């Protein structure tokens, strides 16, 4: 079983998480940002991970540090995965009513994010929509992963939720074990 724990404390946040890559979609998530909890739960459920996450942040200022640092910690956990015999690449397309999200991932050690999500409103619940892309940047930079995504739709809730579901499915695909593969790189290392 591939289980990774990360604890990170700064002057802005205190985060503790336990991530089981080979889980079944169970979660206990508390960030005190209800919509963020909701989309993280969707990510976990559709990625078939198990996640225990407690995040305390300086929400009296805003939600930026909490969202960013959760992305950092999830990336740190993902970066602990043994790269030998994983599929490395994953992708998913998820519709949600009028919205659709497409995500492609490479766990090849090259952090980069390319995406087209541009929010049409400032917040969904208490979550600042401008932090969505920053969450993925934080996760990519600390998880050494390449993330590409495209989102279409009208409803911000639907677009964001479809994106997190697709991200979970793509990440699940990329982390699957394939004994035939070895290290998936012509360099011989990731």
Curated annotation (Swiss-Prot):
Catalytic activity annotation: D-erythro-1-(imidazol-4-yl)glycerol 3-phosphate = 3-(imidazol-4-yl)-2-oxopropyl phosphate + H2O
Entries under PROSITE patterns matching the protein: IGP_DEHYDRATASE_1, IGP_DEHYDRATASE_2
Superkingdom to which the source organism belongs: Archaea
CDD domains assigned to the protein according to its UniProt record, in alphabetical order: IGPD
Keywords, in A-Z order: Amino-acid biosynthesis, Cytoplasm, Histidine biosynthesis, Lyase
Gene3D superfamilies in the cross-refs: Imidazole glycerol phosphate dehydratase, domain 1
UniProt keyword annotation of Cytoplasm present: yes
Entry similarity comment: Belongs to the imidazoleglycerol-phosphate dehydratase family.
Protein name as catalogued: Imidazoleglycerol-phosphate dehydratase
Lineage, top ranks: Archaea, Methanobacteriati, Methanobacteriota, Methanomada group, Methanococci
């Amino acid at each position: 079983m591939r289980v990774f724990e990360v604890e990170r404390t700064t002057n802005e946040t205190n985060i503790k998480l336990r991530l089981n890559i080979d889980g079944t979609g169970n979660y206990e998530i508390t960030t005190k940002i209800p919509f963020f909890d909701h989309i993280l739960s969707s990510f976990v459920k559709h990625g078939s991970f198990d996640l225990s996450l407690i995040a305390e942040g300086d929400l009296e200022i805003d939600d930026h540090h909490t969202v960013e640092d959760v992305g950092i910690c999830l990336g740190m956990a993902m970066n602990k995965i043994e790269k030998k015999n994983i599929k490395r690449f994953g992708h998913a397309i998820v519709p949600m009513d009028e919205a659709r999200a497409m995500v492609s991932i490479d766990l090849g050690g090259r952090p980069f994010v390319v995406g087209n999500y541009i929010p049409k409103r400032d917040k969904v619940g208490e979550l600042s929509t401008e932090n969505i892309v920053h969450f993925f940047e934080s996760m990519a930079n600390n998880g050494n992963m390449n993330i590409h995504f495209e989102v279409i739709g009208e409803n911000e809730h639907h677009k964001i939720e479809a994106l997190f579901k697709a991200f979970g499915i793509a990440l699940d695909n990329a982390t699957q074990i394939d004994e035939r593969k070895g290290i998936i790189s012509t360099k011989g290392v990731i």
